[in-house]
Amino acid sequence: MSVQSNSNSSGSLDGAPSCSQFSTGSPTPGSVSPLDIFAPRRHKEGMDELHSLDPRRQELLEARFIGAVSGNTGGSTGSASGGPKGLNNNECSSHSFGSLGSSSDKESETPEKKHFESSRGRKRKVDNQSESSQGKSSGRGPKISDYFDFQGGNGSSPVRGLPSVLRSPQNSHSAPGAIVRQNSSSPTSLCFMDHTMNLKQLSSRSVQTDLTLLKLAALESNKNLDLEKKEGRIDDLLRANCDLRRQIDEQQKLLERFKERLNKCTTMSKKLLIEKSTQEKQSCREKSMQDRLRLGHFTTVRHGASYSEQWTDGYAFQNLVKQQEWINQQREEIERQRKLLAKRKPSSTPSSQSPTPNESKQRKTKAVNGADNDPFLKPSLPTLLTVAEYHEQEEIFKLRLGHLKKEEAEIQAELERLERVRNLHIRELKRINNEDSSQFKDHPTLNERYLLLHLLGRGGFSEVYKAFDLFEQRYAAVKIHQLNKNWREEKKENYHKHACREYRIHKQLDHPRIVKLYDYFSLDTDTFCTVLEFCEGNDLDFYLKQHKLMSEKEARSIVMQIVNALRYLNEIKPSIIHYDLKPGNILLVDGTACGEIKITDFGLSKIMDDDSYGVDGMDLTSQGAGTYWYLPPECFVVGKEPPKISNKVDVWSVGVIFFQCLYGRKPFGHNQSQQDILQENTILKATEVQFPAKPVASNEAKAFIRRCLAYRKEDRSDVHQLGSDSYLLPHMRRSNSSGNLQATPASPAPSGIISY
């Protein structure tokens, strides 16, 4: 009964570790044993449990500890035998440390459990006795040898070589801490010590190498050398870094000084440019005031309820008019005297010879006495002159008429010169008036870059200023587009879209015969600007108004440059049709006809992309736009579908410009307005071009113009054919005798001279 009570009390210790916790493999270096983790707690619990056992239980445990030495040899044989004991030991050894403190349903059987279950079976039913595991035990109490039946294993494994007291269920629940603490007096502790030493030896052997002390010393010396090199390299890099930082600081300071100096230079440049522009404006106004008296000025004249400006000539024109009137009076007087002289012209026949002195006396007497009874007094007949006297007077009159004619030619030349100067004067007056009314007249700096100097011209919705680019240090032409504030938003958007389209087309162009577009920016919602290349000279239209016409060589040079630019526009992808070629859009760089030209104003340009351009050309969506004198007949055709155009539109414009340069007039609709041209279908009727007799032009030039002004666009040359035309080839020379073009070997021309 005491055994059963002890087994019940020992069986209540469910938190003690089982024997499977000691069945792990070989410990690795640095691993911590579960016995070491739970040793203090188990020792305390084991000591309390030992004191609570009865004396008989203590005697049994002491006898078990004493027989542990002999149990080590017997354990190997016991583990080799099969049966339920070996199975239970394997089950116990298969548990992991995760089952610590848990009561498993596969708990190992002990003699106490057998005895307890058999005793319980007697009280209940006989049928329950067959359910006990591994046979029935007798009614007597457990023997000491029953506690050693569960010592299995061959003794070679550290886990299986553990003493039986550790594998016993009762002792595993009773005093695990006491077993661990008995390391010096117990043989089991000695076994643990030997096993631990073996593990340490194995772990130490696994890290041993074949390195000798010399090799270690060499490696250490090499490592030290490498370390010294690295430290030296680090020091060098640190010094270089410090030097670079110092240089960066110096360069930064130098850059700041340069920036400050640049700002000072920019400020001074702005100041000097403004001073120069102010002086130029002042001198222009003074000169304009002086020319007002000499050349004329505008006066306001009232016509009913309206006012209009009327031009009044200055004293220079008035003097020329007076001189012209005097010359006319002198010419009339000479003509009158010549008529009188003709009456006194002597007769060429002998009968009409001069009378004798007696006959002349008789005639005088008759005249005084009133002979022939004539009641009226008759004037005396003019005295006939001799032949010598007549020729002498005739020669004098001819010389006087010739002198008057020469003076009249001089006056006419002076009048033409004054008219050209007057045109400049009128243009300057309008420019000054527009500049004074402009909001950009006080030299503002647009976009913090472009300093406006003075107004160049003004159009319908734009102003063009000469400006100075402070960043690039160059002159530029700034075109300021100002929208009408009273416009609808839709109209403003269309205008802005049109300007952006012109900017996108013009921005991608890069050719020496095309004005470059530098920049584009906005000032406000109703104002935006485009920055263009600045040219000192005027346009071709102003030149023709001043000089009427030019020589064929000069006109041919201009046409060659225009065709060169058109070839570039048709070689890029997508190709571009200018559509608005006219003398006003051709700038003379030097202001003369013998220099370079540049094409500008791509506002009406057409892009010939793959979507809109076909075999017959592209649709003209902006019919009615452009300058009518320079557009071909296909642009005026009205039908259900819009007309098709191609680069032959620009070829027609080239022919009109060439004709105007040679003859000083337009070939079609010269004195007509655009409205008259549209109403009278002037261009649609222009089937053939007519050349004036003067000035004289070569047949090759006329043939070239005919090829450009062919009425049907199918018969007209395109831009590529025009570029390879024989008339424009530079190696052709004109023969002085025949007037035809002859091919001559090109001789090396001196530098700076263009040979045509």
From Swiss-Prot:
Catalytic-site annotation from UniProt: 580
Comp. bias regions, Basic and acidic residues: 45-56, 104-120
Signal peptide positions (record): none
Highest taxon in the source lineage: Eukaryota
Gene Ontology molecular functions: ATP binding; protein serine kinase activity; protein serine/threonine kinase activity
Bias-annotated ranges (Polar residues): 735-745
Chief site of localization: nucleus
Cofactors, names only: Mg(2+)
Keyword Metal-binding in record: no
Stretches of the chain forming a coiled coil according to its record: 243-268, 397-435
GO BP annotation list: chromosome segregation; intracellular signal transduction
Top EC class of this enzyme: transferase
GO cellular component, one term: nucleus
Binding site for ATP: 456-464, 479
Domain Protein kinase: 450-728
Subcellular location(s) of the protein: Nucleus
Region (Disordered): 1-56, 69-185, 339-375, 734-756
Pfam family, one: Pkinase
Catalytic activity of the protein: L-seryl-[protein] + ATP = O-phospho-L-seryl-[protein] + ADP + H(+); L-threonyl-[protein] + ATP = O-phospho-L-threonyl-[protein] + ADP + H(+)
E.C. numbers: 2.7.11.1
Similarity section: Belongs to the protein kinase superfamily. Ser/Thr protein kinase family.
Protein name per the record: Serine/threonine-protein kinase tousled-like 1-B
Organism this protein belongs to: Danio rerio
The gene coding this protein: tlk1b
